[in-house]
From Swiss-Prot:
It is found in: Cytoplasm. One of its GO terms (biological process) is one-carbon metabolic process. Catalyzes the reversible interconversion of 5-formyl-H(4)MPT to methenyl-H(4)MPT(+). This is Methenyltetrahydromethanopterin cyclohydrolase. One of its GO terms (cellular component) is cytoplasm. Belongs to the MCH family. It catalyses: 5,10-methenyl-5,6,7,8-tetrahydromethanopterin + H2O = N(5)-formyl-5,6,7,8-tetrahydromethanopterin + H(+). InterPro entries: METHMP_CycHdrlase. GO terms for molecular function: methenyltetrahydromethanopterin cyclohydrolase activity. HAMAP family: McH (MF_00486). It comes from Methanocaldococcus jannaschii (strain ATCC 43067 / DSM 2661 / JAL-1 / JCM 10045 / NBRC 100440) (Methanococcus jannaschii).
Amino acid sequence: MLSVNKKALEIVNKMIENKEEINIDVIKLENGATVLDCGVNVPGSWKAGKLFTKICLGGLAHVGISLSPCECKGITLPYVKIKTSHPAIATLGAQKAGWAVKVGKYFAMGSGPARALAKKPKKTYEEIGYEDDADVAVLCLEASKLPNEEVAEYVAKECGVEVENVYLLVAPTASLVGSIQISGRVVENGTYKMLEVLEFDVNKVKYAAGLAPIAPIIGDDFAMMGATNDMVLYGGITYYYIKSDENDDIESLCKALPSCASKDYGKPFMEVFKAADYDFYKIDKGMFAPAVVVINDMTTGKVYRAGKVNAEVLKKSLGWTEL
């Protein structure tokens, strides 16, 4: 079986080798663990954001960045593009931000391949039927502070590996790399909703592609949390190839999948978050989805499209000024 941690390590080694070119720093902790600073005390770069995103996806996706008008009328933004032939493993088995790393006063949302070793959360791996037995652990952290030896020891223990085989990549939300990697979750937002909300077997998704605008740096981590979410919810476009069986209603799946099917749709994420008393659990889970969904039912040959790009909400979210 494919090892997302071993695949990711190949990319990590390239980042370490080219650290000066891609504006990152590499720190060797006293216990032997390796930290890659991709935006805390360094600027990062487009290339670092691209590679960070690819690592999040367990090395099982193509990641590209371009400047494209796409469907966002009146808004010009860079876009991240994702293509994968292993959608369930890459997005849910690796990329999903399913590990809240809390050690002492340190907190970060963890995503990427190491989750497959620690089985965070276990149910996800049971549902997609995937496990990794690598002797290295690669974890991506969304945080504004770098982890210490204690954090690395915790990750090593949870993953069942030696601490010197732990690699921790860190990027704040309010950084170029952080913004890129969050928009790079556009395909994962769809597979997440399929599995967690609509209870659809994501192993039937054979190929997937998507693109989403990359949020400008408009403020601190809290402000960027809103902007980065909006890029996917109101600007993300996805395409899924599904091998259905006779019991699947793919038309209904497509109709229910985009963010506009949610009762909380229509306002910038920060407004929705505020109305929910800043409690994620009060927000409709169905809102966390791409703006546009296209599904090719490979069994019937039919193609369905649902959702829309909402340029007005994107402009409002970013405080867009047209001169």
